[in-house]
Swiss-Prot record:
InterPro entries listed in its UniProt record: Elafin-like_sf, WAP_dom
S-S pairs: C34-C62, C41-C66, C49-C61, C55-C70
Subcellular location(s) per record: Secreted
A Pfam short name: WAP
Protein name per its UniProtKB record: WAP four-disulfide core domain protein 12
Any one GO BP annotation for this protein: defense response to bacterium
Native source organism of the sequence: Saimiri boliviensis boliviensis (Bolivian squirrel monkey)
Signal sequence region: 1-23
């Protein structure tokens, strides 16, 4: 009798643990890409968020300017693009201007 109660208790605890861990895993990533961050930091700021679910609306939890913050994401990557390129910048119009890193990419036509 005691062993059956113990078994029921253990099974119940296992089920509660599984259900609780599924709630934690349920954090989904919001659409969009974090903006490029080219800032070098001497010291990191305390995080304002840990996951996208900590942010309101469409904002994502991104590492930007020395700490994790809730920011508005840039557009989704276009097909063939690289995660490292900043898709929020427009493609250059002519070949004369100085282009920061990320401008020569698969999404901008070569001139």
């Amino acid at each position: 009798m005691r062993s059956s109660r113990f078994l029921v208790l253990m099974v119940s605890l296992a089920l509660v643990t599984l259900v609780a861990s599924e709630g934690v895993k349920g954090n989904t990533e919001k659409p969009g890409v974090c903006p490029a961050d080219n800032v070098r930091c001497i010291k990191s700021d305390p995080p304002q968020c840990h996951t996208d679910q900590d942010c309101q609306g469409i904002r994502k939890c991104c590492y930007l300017h020395c700490g994790f913050k809730c920011v508005i994401p840039v557009k989704e990557l276009e097909e063939g693009g690289s995660k490292d390129e900043d898709v929020s910048r427009p493609c250059p119009e002519s070949g004369w201007e100085v282009k920061p890193p990320g401008f020569f990419s698969t999404r901008c036509p070569q001139k």
